[in-house]
C-alpha cells in the first residue's frame, strides 16, 4: 500500500503500532489525533518522553521504575519493613499500589519462569530476593504472582529457595472476584475458590 504521508509520519505510526494494544489502524488514528492536537498534546508528550528518557531509573532495591533510586516506595518510612510483596513486573506493583492493597515493600522479579520462552532463574532477580529475605526485619514474603502455570512454577521455585530463610511465605488468594457471577467463571477459578474457602 502506498504511503499517503511523508516518511516522518509513517515512522510515527510504525512506532505507535509497537505499543501494547495498538495495531496499525489504531496507531494511524493516534498519530492523526496527535498531529491535530499538536500544541495541546504532541508537544507536551514529546517533552514528557524526553524527561522520561533522561530521568527514569530502575530502583536498586526493589526493581520499581521511578525518577530516583532507591525509589519512592523503598524510601517511604511509613511502610511495614516486615513484609515483602513479590511481583512479576512493575505493572503488578503499580496495580497493588492503586488498590492500596499493602503497606509493605516490594520486589520485582522482572518476569516469571518460562522454559518455553527461555526465561530461567538467572533472568530474574531471585538472588536479590533471597538476600532481602534474610534481613532480620522481614517476617513475611507474599508471592503476588499470576495464577498461570508460569506464575505457579515461579512461586514453587521461590518457596523452595526461601526454605532456609526465617520467613513465612504466603500467596494471594485465588477465586471469585468481587462482583463476579459464578456462571461466568472458569472451572479452575471455581475449584480454587472452593479449596480456599474461608469462614463467613
Curated annotation (Swiss-Prot):
Spell out the HAMAP family in the cross-references.
Answer: RecR (MF_00017)
Q: Where is the Toprim domain?
A: 82-177
Q: What is this protein called?
A: Recombination protein RecR
Physiological role: May play a role in DNA repair. It seems to be involved in an RecBC-independent recombinational process of DNA repair. It may act with RecF and RecO.
Q: Which GO terms describe its biological process?
A: DNA recombination; DNA repair
Keywords of this entry: DNA damage, DNA recombination, DNA repair, Metal-binding, Zinc, Zinc-finger
InterPro entries noted in UniProt = DNA_Rcmb_RecR, Rcmb_RecR, Rcmb_RecR_Znf, TOPRIM_dom, TOPRIM_RecR
Which CDD domains does this one have? TOPRIM_recR
Q: Which residue ranges does UniProt annotate as crossing the membrane?
A: none
Organism of derivation: Nitrobacter hamburgensis (strain DSM 10229 / NCIMB 13809 / X14)
Q: Which family does it belong to?
A: Belongs to the RecR family.
Q: Name one Pfam family in it.
A: Toprim_4
Species classification:
Bacteria, Pseudomonadati, Pseudomonadota, Alphaproteobacteria, Hyphomicrobiales
Amino acid at each position: 500500500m502506498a504511503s499517503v504521508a511523508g516518511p516522518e509520519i509513517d515512522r510515527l505510526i510504525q512506532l505507535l503500532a509497537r505499543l501494547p494494544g495498538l495495531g496499525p489502524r489504531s496507531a494511524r488514528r493516534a498519530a492523526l489525533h496527535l498531529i491535530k492536537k499538536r500544541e495541546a498534546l504532541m508537544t507536551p508528550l514529546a517533552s514528557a518522553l524526553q524527561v522520561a528518557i533522561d530521568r527514569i531509573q530502575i530502583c536498586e532495591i526493589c526493581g520499581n521504575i521511578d525518577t530516583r533510586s532507591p525509589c519512592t516506595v523503598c524510601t517511604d518510612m511509613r511502610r511495614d519493613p516486615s513484609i515483602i510483596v513479590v511481583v512479576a513486573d512493575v505493572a503488578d506493583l503499580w496495580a497493588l499500589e492503586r488498590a492500596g492493597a499493602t503497606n509493605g515493600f516490594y520486589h520485582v522479579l522482572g518476569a516469571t519462569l518460562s522454559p518455553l520462552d527461555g526465561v530461567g532463574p538467572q533472568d530474574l532477580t531471585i538472588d536479590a530476593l533471597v538476600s532481602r529475605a534474610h534481613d532480620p526485619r522481614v517476617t513475611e514474603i507474599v508471592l503476588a504472582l499470576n495464577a498461570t502455570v508460569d506464575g505457579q512454577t515461579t512461586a514453587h521455585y521461590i518457596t523452595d529457595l526461601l526454605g532456609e530463610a526465617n520467613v513465612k511465605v504466603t500467596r494471594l488468594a485465588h477465586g471469585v472476584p468481587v462482583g463476579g457471577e459464578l456462571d461466568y467463571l472458569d472451572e479452575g477459578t471455581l475449584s480454587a475458590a472452593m479449596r480456599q474457602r474461608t469462614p463467613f
